Amino acid sequence: MKKRLVTFGLAAVAAVTLLAAGCGEGKNYIKMSYYDETSYEEGANYSTIDENLFYRNERKVDVADPCVVYVNDEKDADYGSYYLYGTTGNTGFFCWKSDDLVNWEGVGYALLYRDLSTPQGKAVSVDSWAPEVIYDGEADKWYMFFSSTPKDSSNSYIPYIAQSDSPAGPFELIDHIDSYTATDGTPLKDIENIETNNSYYYQRYMTFDPLKMSQALEKLGLADMDATSDVLRAIDFHPYVDSSTGDKYLYFNTSVNSYIMGMKMNSWTEPEYGTLTIISKPGYSTPSAAEKDVPNEMNTSVNEAAWITEHGGKYYLTYSTNSYKDKTYQVCQAVADKPLGEFRKLTEAEGGILLSADSALRDDVSGTGHSSIINAGGQDYIIYHAHNSIAEGGSSRHVAVDEIEWIMVKDAQGNDLDVMYANGPTTSVQPLPEFASEYKNIAAQAEVSATGIADGSSVSFLTDGLLSINRYANYDMVETYIKETEFSGETTITLKFDDYKTIRALMVYNSKNMESAFYDIERVEFDCRLEDGTFATKYIDGLAYDIKAYTSTDDIDVLRPASSAIAEFDEIECNEIRITITPATEEQIPVHGFNDLAILAVSEIRVLGK
């Protein structure tokens, strides 16, 4: 057949139209105008991306111990926004707000005490850590839980509670002088000159009544846990409301022994002391375990940063282990049938380590821990901090966000168990949350087929929502449940929709393994319905994969995970996509070809559309 040229006006780009060969039927082909997110400004470490569609976990907001809350108070001017709090200084806490969980606008100090001559200022003197905030509709108040070290006191990491009418603050310490009692039985209101008494002045602002908490600890056999203090010293508070009952709970981490504790709250200012419970102990799979039995916690004395997530009638505790200064700081998960447990830490075969920098495998991220988990637009996300310096770790950290998916695994008894799986930590380009970009991943709506599938593999892995990430942590779980679609050679993957869909971008995620990775996408074809009602196949040849960004050295030694070849374009109406990929050559990726089981593998395909 003869080829013919036709000119189309498409986004001010000349389009070439060809007559298709085969089947005796003419078909219009239009070369597509697109952007692949791989353009670099001079001297830039990161490519320029369309931030209306995508994000990347760059260093945007320096903050440690992030807590993110949704503003659900309809009276508030920021209703529908998200607020971010964290460890930001000695005497107070800065906060930010966002509409997309990625781009944060500074609001100001939610809590700040500069005058150290006042009791409040002295109480919040140094080492103000890990604020968490919650809104209470009944009281119409926002409450902040945190710890700080009082001025001129022998005690450190004192737990405090503050309140505000707004998530932006100002939060003010709540004064309990009329109701609290010192551990020696003296009511605080009866202590003379309490404002200048360095042993007592700060106790009026504490989260817990000193005497009642002391008695609760004694009941648990923990009266002598801290020989250096007569009041509880604690950090990393987490207020939580059970969605099924409306009951309130408060979790925290003891500064001695690093136990995670939990208790029921009658209100956010009135604990139910008799419910105080040990939730987790470093190294022990359950609080009642007779000896240490968690392999990945044998060399750590840290369990901290509790967060509770409900799912399927169970309660999931996420917590961090190891030193926050180390690359190995990571998030783990445990499960229970009740808010106060008993919680059982998941084994690595069950996915016990949720988020880890995997020091032997990652050169692009470090110290991923102290997380919040929230549901936004129907998708769960984990918000965590990572080190600013990958090489040195330390105290300087920034906020990052990745998706959480739920997968079903077999527990140690062979029973089905839902567990969290993190699509991260990532430093690669990822799609913005749907509620922010207005485009969702519709790939799972398509009927998927492919040529050249390797024995034992399946196209179902291409649209399961799970990004494959090379991990030593949870290695058995990842190898068992997080699958890539493997091919014995060149493949054409077809996604066929039951009707025309509005599509804005395509993401083809590479293999986690260098030996089965692709170098680029040979061709992508979109069967489209044009604005004038006619039909054409729009195509892209040689869609780039940003090999520069996703390899660790010039020798292409390590492939960074959850990375994709991306094409974004003006909206099209499309009912079928065909993606042709060929295995990389030794010249393109020198380590390619090590794997005898699969020459080529693809982790995931995402189609951003409506």
List each language-model region with its residue ranges.
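Aromatic, loop-rich ligand-recognition surfaces of beta-strand-rich domains
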Residues: 473-537, 561-610
